[in-house]
Regions:
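N-terminal secretory signal peptides and thylakoid transit peptides that target proteins
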Residues: 1-15
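A contiguous active-site-proximal alpha/beta segment in oxidoreductase catalytic domains
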Residues: 138, 148-229
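N-terminal glycine-/serine-/threonine-rich beta1-alpha1-beta2 phosphate-ribose binding loop
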Residues: 12, 22-151, 161, 165-168, ...
């Protein structure tokens, strides 16, 4: 695990290297593959951490990587890729393959950062944006196969909008034996309070409440839930069914206590953005107020193979943050926390995520389980399909089993 001490050590080592040019040449080479590179896009938030560094533990860290190439799929108005390439001296290539080979005939980078988010892409009938993450990955691994060498890969957010493709990506990474890290910033950002699910705890019910759009924030919400419940007794057992709800059905199940009424209350009590009526100070809203403010609540009810049930809730108009609560066996009080997302423009939670990408690039191993994001990618797909079809969906294909270590991996400094 990368720590402040190791960050400062690497930065100090670079500072002692004679000559800036020599220090740069000693750095590992990084290729960026991204949909777009615009202001406040994920490339702007994440790839640029490897251009000018980022804060960690009260110090400014400069990763021992040099961005040497990029592929930018779309260049809408406001594109910043050319300006960044000129400022930092990297080359933008017309294809993924050329970016990885840097115009030559062999793989010429030590790591690949994939950011398949934002841009204009078609949607499926279920509202899934068909971002080309799988297509990027296949081109990357095509280079690896042809050139007889691999490099670690970080993939931002979902693996793919199609679970079969997501599974193929994971299987390929394991078969070719290269480090593969992916997912949301939610599991690795700061928490208030800084708690984790006790390792090996028996979990009866869990919930995360947030705002946001479908196929975007539902994934973040599910990643927040999964990074907690995967620590439960027996480890991850996979998901057997998903059912989506919206509108009055959500309020009915919450108010009747079907989904853990006390967990909903704990989540709202952890929120820093809980909506209030005009002129009122911080109060717990009434059910009538919540129904008035949240025009169309959405929930995914997720059933796990070991009997655990979790609820993903999108409550636009009620909150603008992510809060989690869980009922642990033998504990009358829910475990609860806020996943803290520092504000724009700096959004330093992306720095926390890029520290995991950097660790993957340096060690060749992901510090977080790729199976987590495989599973959450599949739950997101199932949730959107259930919402469209209006029925519970059994998910035998989501029998994703894995174990995590005892050590926590979220930001604390």
């Amino acid at each position: 695990m990368i720590t402040r001490r190791s960050f400062l050590g690497s930065a100090a080592g670079l500072a002692l290297t004679p000559g800036v040019r020599a220090a740069e040449s000693a750095k590992k080479k990084l290729a960026v593959v991204t949909n777009i590179w615009n202001y406040r896009s994920h490339a702007w938030h994440m790839a640029e951490r490897f251009l000018h560094g980022y804060p960690i533990g009260g110090a400014w860290h400069h990763p021992p990587f040099e961005v040497v190439s990029a592929y930018v799929d779309q260049k809408p108005e406001g594109d910043l890729s050319a300006a960044r390439a000129k400022e930092f001296g990297f080359t933008i290539y017309p294809t993924v393959e050329e970016a990885l080979r840097r115009g030559g005939k062999q793989l010429a980078v030590d790591a690949v950062l994939v950011i398949g988010e934002h841009g204009t892409y078609p949607k499926t009938e279920f509202g899934q944006i068909q971002y080309p993450r799988y297509e990027y990955f296949k081109k990357i691994t095509g280079v690896y196969k042809a050139d007889g060498r691999t490099a670690p890969v970080f993939n931002d957010k979902h693996l793919s909008w199609k679970f079969a493709w997501a599974k193929e990506m994971v299987d390929l990474s394991k078969g070719m034996k290269f480090g593969f890290c992916a997912g949301s910033s939610l599991p690795v950002t700061w928490r208030m309070p800084a708690v984790d699910l006790p390792f090996g705890a028996e979990v009866e019910e869990a919930m995360c409440v947030s705002n946001g759009a479908l196929d975007i924030y539902d994934f973040h919400n599910l990643e927040a839930i999964q990074c907690m419940v995967e620590r439960r007794k027996g480890g991850e057992t996979g998901v057997v069914a998903v059912q989506a709800f919206k509108g009055d059905d959500v309020w009915k199940h919450v108010s009747q206590g079907d989904w853990g009424k006390e967990l909903f209350g704990a989540c709202l009590s952890r929120s820093h953005t809980l909506a209030q009526a005009p002129t009122l100070s911080h109060r717990m809203p009434t059910w009538d107020q919540m129904k008035e403010w949240v025009k169309e609540p959405v929930a995914y009810r997720v059933e796990y193979a070991d009997g655990l049930k979790t609820t993903m809730m999108l409550m636009n108009g009620l909150v603008s943050d992510f809060t989690f609560a869980a009922k642990l066996k033998g504990d009358p009080k829910p475990l609860s926390t806020l996943f803290h997302l520092p504000p724009t423009p700096n959004v330093t939670y992306s720095a926390a995520l890029m520290s995991k990408a950097e660790e993957t690039f340096l060690t060749g191993k992901s510090p977080t389980p790729i199976e987590r994001t495989l599973l959450t990618s599949g739950i997101t797909e199932a949730g959107l399909q259930s919402l469209k079809k209006g029925q519970r969906l059994e998910t035998p294909h989501l029998a994703v089993k894995y174990q995590v270590g005892k050590e926590s991996t979220f930001a604390r400094e």
